[in-house]
């Protein structure tokens, strides 16, 4: 919004004063700081209201370790605070002409709506398991397809007819492998592959949100990682490099994305603004969600954040790399898949309880220790993902 205002008045005296708004780096930092301050400002009032509205509700699932019963009475649906701060920071500082920004907002808020329905059913019908899994999957698929529709445009065939095409690149990039070596094009099959990434990530974050602060810090780390990846893939910055021309070395300016051997992402800098808003909103929520938590994010937060991270993986062309970035989330959902498959096939359980963080709880590990160790692993995963930029 502020960027559009700057474009309108850029040739005036006021426009020269607001010249800093044209720099993505400023708007990235500003979006994060604004989302953080907004969350810290309205967080206490929102939590107090949630506690009042949910008085007498347990908000603790029955299929969790007995130690979780002490968390009864802690309000849920705190993810509404995260979504509000993300939307405000993005709308205020991103370039709203970018279609990618609107697609990410739609995907995030759409998945947040699904989470809201799930939380509301659990609260309104005590001991309810919320929205049925099949209905949840249908709604997740619906909002994903709406996002894909937002990325469609038309092109003209040689015979003059029109056909749809995706605005995003349908080629895949692999970590540690330059695109010039291996860069398969999935064509329209890419839509199905992206669906697995987006819906899978959303559900993985949802499964991870079982301990105080466990899901939000890996989300923050992932958002920071994606901010870097989006910025370098979308920036117009170039790097001095040598090129051999006619047997002689010549100094040339090589675009940063080309130098790093990754795909270009048009509008990547604006996606970085969105990432920064997630970081700011996440830090403000962590202030209230750290052990012992004053509020839980609920499905309204976990499904939305997972959808956002999956969407960023898709739009930044890091679908495969996201398996590294989301290492903790991937491990959590994988543990559930292993547990279910093992029990159905052999009648035996691999873990004491799934997702895997409950396994460590039942082994006697203290909740804060599990949380911090998972945070450390998440940071390492983000570092490895960024390292893959250079090792190509």
Swiss-Prot record:
The encoding gene is mraY
**What are the GO MF terms of this UniProt record?**
metal ion binding; phospho-N-acetylmuramoyl-pentapeptide-transferase activity; UDP-N-acetylmuramoyl-L-alanyl-D-glutamyl-meso-2,6-diaminopimelyl-D-alanyl-D-alanine:undecaprenyl-phosphate transferase activity
GO CC annotations on file? plasma membrane
Q: Which CDD domains match?
A: GT_MraY (cd06852)
* Major localisation: membrane
Q: Which reaction does it catalyse?
A: UDP-N-acetyl-alpha-D-muramoyl-L-alanyl-gamma-D-glutamyl-meso-2,6-diaminopimeloyl-D-alanyl-D-alanine + di-trans,octa-cis-undecaprenyl phosphate = di-trans,octa-cis-undecaprenyl diphospho-N-acetyl-alpha-D-muramoyl-L-alanyl-D-glutamyl-meso-2,6-diaminopimeloyl-D-alanyl-D-alanine + UMP
Taxonomically, the superkingdom here is Bacteria
Tell me its family: Belongs to the glycosyltransferase 4 family. MraY subfamily.
Question: Mind listing the GO biological process terms from this record?
Answer: cell division; cell wall organization; peptidoglycan biosynthetic process; regulation of cell shape
**What is the protein name stated in its UniProt record?**
Phospho-N-acetylmuramoyl-pentapeptide-transferase
Q: Which organism is it from?
A: Myxococcus xanthus (strain DK1622)
């Amino acid at each position: 919004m502020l960027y559009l205002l700057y474009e309108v008045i850029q040739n005036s005296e006021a426009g020269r004063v607001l010249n800093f708004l044209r720099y993505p780096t400023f708007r990235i930092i500003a979006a994060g700081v604004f989302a953080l301050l907004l969350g810290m400002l309205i967080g206490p009032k929102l939590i107090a209201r949630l506690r009042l509205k949910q008085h007498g509700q347990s908000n603790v699932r029955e299929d969790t370790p007995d130690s979780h019963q002490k968390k009864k009475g802690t309000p849920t649906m705190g993810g509404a605070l995260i979504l509000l701060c993300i939307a405000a920071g993005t709308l205020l500082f991103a370039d709203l002409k970018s279609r990618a920004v609107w697609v990410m907002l739609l995907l995030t808020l759409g998945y947040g709506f699904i989470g809201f329905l799930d939380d509301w059913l659990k609260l309104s019908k005590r001991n309810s398991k919320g929205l049925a899994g099949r209905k949840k999957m249908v709604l997740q698929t619906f909002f994903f397809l709406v996002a894909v529709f937002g990325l469609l445009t038309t092109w003209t065939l040689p015979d003059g007819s029109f056909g749809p095409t995706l605005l995003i690149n349908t080629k895949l990039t692999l970590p540690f492998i330059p695109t010039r070596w291996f860069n398969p094009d999935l064509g329209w099959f890419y839509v199905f592959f992206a669906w697995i990434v987006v819906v899978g990530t959303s559900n993985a974050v949802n499964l991870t949100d079982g301990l105080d602060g466990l899901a939000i810090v890996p989300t923050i780390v992932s958002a920071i990682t994606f901010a870097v990846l989006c910025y370098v893939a979308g920036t117009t910055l170039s790097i001095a490099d040598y090129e051999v021309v006619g047997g002689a070395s010549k100094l040339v300016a090589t675009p940063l994305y080309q130098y790093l051997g990754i795909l270009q992402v048009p509008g990547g800098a604006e996606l970085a603004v969105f990432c920064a808003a997630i970081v700011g909103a996440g830090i403000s929520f962590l202030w209230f969600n750290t052990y012992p938590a004053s509020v839980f994010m609920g499905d309204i937060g976990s499904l939305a954040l997972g959808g956002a991270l999956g969407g960023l993986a898709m739009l930044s062309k890091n679908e495969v790399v996201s398996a590294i970035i989301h290492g903790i989330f991937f491990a959590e959902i994988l543990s559930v898949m292993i547990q279910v498959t093992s029990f159905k096939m052999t009648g035996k359980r691999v873990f004491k309880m799934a997702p895997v963080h409950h396994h460590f709880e039942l082994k006697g590990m203290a909740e804060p220790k599990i949380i911090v160790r998972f945070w450390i692993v998440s940071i390492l995963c983000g570092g490895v993902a960024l390292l893959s930029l250079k090792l190509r």
